[in-house]
Amino acid sequence: MHEAGTPTYAYDLEAVAAEVREMRAAFEGGAHLVAYAVKANSAGPVIRAVGAEGCGADVVSGAEILVALGCGIPPERIVYSGVAKGDGEIDRALACGERGIGALQVESMEEIDRVEARACALGRRARVSVRVNPGVDVTDETHAHIATGHDAAKFGVSRDDVAVAARRVESSKQLELVGISAHAGSQLSSIGPYLEVARVVFGIVGDLRRAGCGRALAFVDTGGGFGIDYGAAPPRRNKAPEPDGRSSTPPRPADFIRAVRAEQIKSGLGDLALCVEPGRSLVAPHGVLLAGVIQAKVTRTTRWVMIDAGMNDLLRPALYQARHRVVPLDREVDPAHALTWRVVGPVCESSDDFGEHPLPPDPPGAVAILDAGAYGYTMASTYNGRPLPVEVFIRGGALVGRTQRVNVEAWASERIAAGGDAVPPKQH
């Protein structure tokens, strides 16, 4: 930390790879694709680590396609989701390799028309998966901002329109229907809603097949959203779920997969590959945000610890009211003598607040914000003129890579030069 300074994200690549191996073992030899959600953490060393374990990539932009390809993910292992793909982004997806990416996940009838037009213009045949809105509301499981499968969400084709969409794709010489997909939301704390989404997808595929449609289907995609425990110790590996699918801590991702795989076989769809799209569950527990303590402040009502990392570095607490554990780096916390301190950042917003945590009476010189490996750096900004944090990558306890910190002078110079020599007109 002394070399990199703070704020700094640190990731354990070996632990991330172990998560992938555990997850893939849960398929028990069945055909599958673990499409890592690049939006969770788009750092090259992380993507290369999951790719080396056989993962593909779930991308949501043309830029993420470039990153995935640049990190060695084969085009056929890339699926592209998103409700508003630009023409240039569609072109990029279609131009990859010999046949384009594995699947463009179309989310509306209008998008089907656009993908067909771009494929025609490029002389390509697009592999397409229809993303279904499953009508499963998980807002009692997760934050409303990351619940994506309910009827009022912007995502996916309505269940009532999926058959029409599938026939539309199959009627086109430029399109090939290869999958049916859905996604309920992120940070799911129980298996039940995930299984509900899977049953919707499997039911639709069964209906399509009975109607003579979907003969070229290669996979079913039940999305990601496997939750982690942000508030206590990470859940035990291979922890068995409760009988009703709920648990005091979220089940392991492998438990989700085993449950949905059993449902897939029960539905008579064992001939299709099963695709899942994990992000958070692979990387969040194995990343921390290191922050220096600037000072303490004690008022009549609150003990404050003010750190140099803020909502510009880790937005989740401000955006989702998320809680991350904060622990001192230089000593253990003695529960018998710990005091409750409110940990806050330097940004000029009251929402720049990491919550109350037990810390020593004499605050530490630095802290670690835990479980910060997902949706941390990828959501960071330079708000309040605070340059992006550094990222460091660790394997086997050794530093294997790091990014460079942008100093404030460089940031200021870029902003000063923005727009060239444009000056306001003189007032007369």
Features from the language model and the residues they span:
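Active-site loop/helix belt of alpha/beta enzymes
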Residues: 134-295, 384-386
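The start of beta-strands in P-loop NTPase/AAA+ ATPase cores
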Residues: 34, 56, 126, 178, ...
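Short, glycine-/Ser/Thr-/acidic-enriched flexible segments
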Residues: 15, 41, 64, 85, ...
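Solvent-exposed alpha-helices and their adjacent loops that cap or buttress functional pockets
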Residues: 70-73, 95-98, 120-124, 147, ...
